[in-house]
Design a protein with these regions (language model features):
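N-terminal Lys/Arg-rich, disordered targeting/topogenic segments
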Residues: 1-14
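Solvent-exposed, non-transmembrane regions of membrane-associated and secreted proteins
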Residues: 29-266
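Hydrophobic membrane-insertion alpha-helices, especially the h-region
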Residues: 16-36
Length: 266
């Protein structure tokens, strides 16, 4: 059969299309490989920083002050250590000069895309405010505050209710009270200064308005509260927030968990 110019043109176009498709496929394959490597390197970096610090994780039997002196020697911004039972949340807490400093630094102060768990810069680093906010990235494999997602399941929320925050001079025992999804710019949930009872009533009203689940006795203005916040996949500005009450402090003779009088930042 005689091959016409149209035949060669069609053949050439087919080769071009196949070549372009092959290039696109190889680019996609390379990108997928890079994404996997990038995710691994992020998780590996945060794990390495934690391994360095976990040796000095506070222990009541060994003595809180000794362990914290070691941690603070590595980074003076370390102010606590949080553990939420039956989750992967088991990390040092830092406090920076603002709420941006530790978004991309590990708890040793080194550059790290997974960041750190950090206390709002306006809160007292001694954890004496009536309402405090802890923030952390929502990372894969439950790293950092990724496991806050677990509390979006009502069964998990109701069965897993406890946690601790280790401080240089005492341990705060936490009890979960509410799980909510809010906007990142919520003027109540992310406000840290609540100077009087009437203002704190507004905060409590907001918590219960936004709550997906609540448990235990209803929060009151006498409760000292800590909110754990991370990004939510439900929207760009959506945030998951787990509100906990302090039910007991190992350094408190009464163990009432009520608000301390000291509120001035260091």
């Amino acid at each position: 059969m005689e091959r016409t110019p149209e035949y060669y043109l069609t053949k050439g176009l087919d080769m071009v299309v196949n070549g372009v498709a092959a290039v696109i496929f190889l680019c996609c394959l390379a990108y997928a490989g890079y994404a996997l490597w990038d995710n691994w390197s992020i998780l590996d970096g945060s794990e390495n920083a934690l391994k360095t610090m976990v040796e000095y994780k506070p222990d009541e039997e060994e003595g809180l002050s000794y362990n914290f002196s070691q941690l603070m020697a590595m980074n003076p911004d370390v102010c606590g250590w949080i553990v939420m039972d039956h989750t992967g949340i088991d990390y040092p807490i830092v406090q920076g000069e603002d709420n941006f400093e530790y978004l991309d630094k590990d708890a040793l102060g080194n550059p790290e895309i997974s960041g750190s768990i950090f206390l709002d810069w306006q809160n007292n680093r001694k954890f004496t405010d009536p309402y405090m906010v802890l923030m952390g990235h929502h990372m894969q494999a439950g790293k950092m505050f990724g496991d806050l997602d677990k509390y979006s399941d009502e069964t998990f929320f109701r069965k897993n209710t406890t946690g601790k925050i280790y401080l240089p001079d005492r341990v705060l025992y936490l009890e979960t009270a509410a799980f909510l999804t809010v906007d990142a710019y919520d003027k109540y949930i992310y406000r840290t200064q609540w100077d009087n009872v009437s203002e704190r009533q507004e905060l409590l009203k907001r918590i219960y308005e936004q709550a997906q689940y609540t448990r235990g006795e209803e929060l009151t203005t006498e409760d000292q509260m800590i909110a754990l916040s991370t990004c939510s996949t439900s929207g760009t500005n959506a945030r998951h927030v787990l509100v906990c009450r302090i039910v007991h402090s190992s350094a408190s003779e009464e163990g009432s968990g009520k608000v301390y009088v000291e509120t001035e930042n260091e």
